[in-house]
């Protein structure tokens, strides 16, 4: 009888532990599903996760990155402390795609805070990783640098990057992006005095 009770107790505890892990993963997944739909829903699901510091490295990285994005979209202000947690964790667990995206978000945060040296340093660190980026990530990567050089009045560097962005855009049918990219290129040329 005592042995049966211990076995049942162990099974109950085991199911609770695995149930918590499953529910954490489900909440993270639901938060991801709410991206671009509802920031409040993202935050709601993330707030349901109990003890985020006790998650696995992968789950903690996902949690911090989701919380970073939700906070950014809600407040329009980046929260670097969350990126400082998730970037090394993504690298540690081998999630290159998320690591790259978090690094790009870090560069964007530097842009928001008007830290051009930090932006260009981040860009140099990612230079050999562009082959792993999606075309959208590459556009993001080059645009951040382009606007940094533009703000520093380094127009030849900005123009090179504007041309790279346009080359990435041409195969797509995204006419709004093409419009903005051409407009930026023309603005750079105007600043250089080459608008003929």
Predicted regions: what is each one?
Residues 4-5, 10, 16-196:
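A "functional boundary" signal
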